[in-house]
Design a protein with these regions (language model features):
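Beta1/beta-strand and adjacent pyrophosphate-binding region of the FAD-binding site
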Residues: 35-52, 72
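Conserved N-terminal helical subregion
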Residues: 119-236, 241-253
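Glycine-rich FAD pyrophosphate-binding loop
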Residues: 45-47, 61-95
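C-terminal helical "tail/cap" subdomain of flavin- and related membrane-associated enzymes
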Residues: 351, 412-491
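N-terminal mitochondrial targeting presequence
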Residues: 1-40
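N-terminal FAD cofactor-binding segment of flavoenzymes
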Residues: 59, 84-134
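Short beta-strand to alpha-helix junction loop
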Residues: 95-101, 146-173, 302-303, 337-340, ...
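Conserved FAD-binding catalytic core of PHBH/FMO-like flavoproteins
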Residues: 107, 212, 221-353, 361-364, ...
Length: 491
């Protein structure tokens, strides 16, 4: 069990700003001009105010060893609506995150989870996953595998929470910190360059962040939590390698039939064009994540609400041939689906989700999918976390969990560096973070990428082989099912 950030030992007093320089200054670098005004000096500057960046700011302020650091967070968007978020009871946003137990433990530790409204959180402890071509299926049910509700083992696979809800809770916990970070929103990063020698400090290896307001911030440590197109990563000259999938993820929020007679499960069906998933929300609500081609996503967006609902219901009931045909209809999908379902034998709930009855207005949206991995996570006085370091296909629901795992690791190693008298921007402090996170993240990226490729085949020898593999997992031979489920609960 990993050590709590809040109880890492403190071995020494807070240290002075100026640390030893560990690298020679390259003449090819961009430097602040001699006439530039002196920037405001921070221990840590975080670029990016999404869930990962906010978690980092909250964790730095909550951990005993790092809570004396002077921190600034920069976000281009307006954080006001997120801070003031007050949702309607009968409405859920379309961007939902699946938080695994280890992520929730960290959120509790840094004081965020108490600000998450439990009436808007849906936990689930079972999944139904099946092959859209062969019907081979694996059922992940923690209650069956680990002794039911009376067991001492936590049987929760994940907790479904709206993105904006999580960010709202993080902002609330940041507001409670004794030493609050400087929160700079509605402001873009215009330029990042290296500093200069001043009367107080030698900042020639310090990143200087110039904002759209003209304000300048000097960072003992600059952290990029600024997404897949990270300006911080670009400044550091770190390559990010990977590829686009030529797939988009369609998201939407639905009302569903009464499912009170069935357990709250997540459902995922692997179709050759991409997986389609229904994820549970509180009450009679559910969330869609359908990865498919850009053309099919455009078709789904263009459908009338009743036809779109019929199309999603069909995705869990009809053959791939039928689904492919329905994608060619511009209207009348509901009627056509009703007839095709009447002549098709398909499973019943809880093996498949209950029927969707309505799509919430304004919740249909999509975004492109890609797999990217930075060559490294750290540079001179610089670190990357979350999507700035790695971007993953959403089929496994691990993107944000991996990012928050990065945060835990980075804060832990910063605290360790402080305890050993090291400069927080030095390679001695930062390299252990990369060593701990890079290979596990790379393995997860590779596994999900291969899974995407494997289920893209409609015919050929791999189709029966993958079905055999699914059957072996479902029977829990060699404890494979338990192993996969336990790994899914870790960041």
């Amino acid at each position: 069990m990993r050590q709590s950030l809040l109880h890492l030992p403190i071995k020494r007093s807070p240290w002075a700003f100026q640390g030893s320089r560990l690298a020679r200054i390259s003449a090819a670098r961009s430097y602040a001009s001699e006439s530039s005004p002196n920037p405001e000096v921070y221990d840590v500057v975080v670029v990016g105010g999404g869930p990962v960046g906010l978690t980092l700011a909250a964790a730095l302020g909550a951990a005993r060893t790092t809570n004396n650091l002077k921190v600034a967070l920069i976000e281009g968007m307006n954080l006001g609506p997120t801070r003031d978020w007050n949702p309607k009871p009968e409405y859920f946003a379309n961007r939902i995150v699946s938080l695994i137990p280890s992520t929730v433990r960290l959120l509790k530790e840094i004081g965020t989870w108490k600000h998450i409204r439990q009436d808007r959180v849906q936990s689930y402890d079972g999944m139904q996953v099946w092959d859209g071509m062969t019907g081979s299926r694996v059922e992940f049910d923690w209650n069956k595998l680990w002794g039911g509700k009376d067991s001492q083992t936590d049987t929760t696979i994940a907790h479904m929470v709206e993105n904006i809800h999580l960010s709202h809770g993080l902002l609330k916990s940041i507001d409670e910190l004794a030493l609050k970070p400087t929160m700079i929103d509605k402001t873009k990063v215009e330029k990042i360059e290296y500093g200069k020698m001043t009367n107080e400090l030698d900042m020639r290896d310090w990143p200087i962040v110039t904002l759209s307001t003209g304000q300048k911030l000097a960072a003992r440590l600059l952290i990029g939590a600024d997404g897949g197109n990270s300006p911080v990563r670009t400044f550091a000259g770190i390559e990010s390698r990977g590829w686009d999938y030529d797939r988009h993820s369609m998201v939407a929020t639905f009302r569903i039939e009464d499912d009170s007679l069935f357990p709250k499960f997540a459902y995922q069906r692997f179709l050759p064009s991409g997986p389609v998933a229904i994820l549970p929300l509180p009450g009679n609500f559910a969330n869609l994540a359908w990865s498919t081609t850009p053309e099919k996503v455009a078709h789904l967006k263009s459908l009338a609400p009743e036809d779109f609902v019929a199309m999603v219901n069909a995705a869990f009931r009809l053959s791939y041939t039928d689904i492919d045909y329905l994608h060619n209809l511009k209207s009348g999908v509901a009627e056509e689906t009703k007839w095709r379902e009447s002549v098709t034998k398909y499973p019943e709930p809880p093996q498949i989700p209950v029927r969707i009855t309505e799509v919430l207005e304004g919740t249909r949206a999509s975004f492109p999918l890609k797999m990217k991995h930075a060559d490294k996570y750290v540079g001179e006085r610089l670190a990357l976390v979350g999507d700035a370091a790695h971007t993953i296909h959403p089929m496994a629901g691990q993107g944000l969990n991996s990012g928050i795992g990065d945060v835990y690791s980075l804060v832990k190693h910063l605290a360790d560096g402080i305890n050993h008298g090291q400069d927080i921007g030095s390679s001695f402090t930062l390299e252990p973070y990369q060593a701990e996170r890079y290979l596990p993240n790379n393995a997860l990226l590779g596994f999900v990428d291969k899974l995407h490729t494997l289920y893209g085949f409609e015919t050929g020898p791999l189709v029966p082989l993958r079905s055999l593999g699914v059957e072996i997992i479902n029977k829990d031979w060699f404890g494979l099912k338990r192993f996969l489920m336990s790994q899914a609960a870790k960041s």
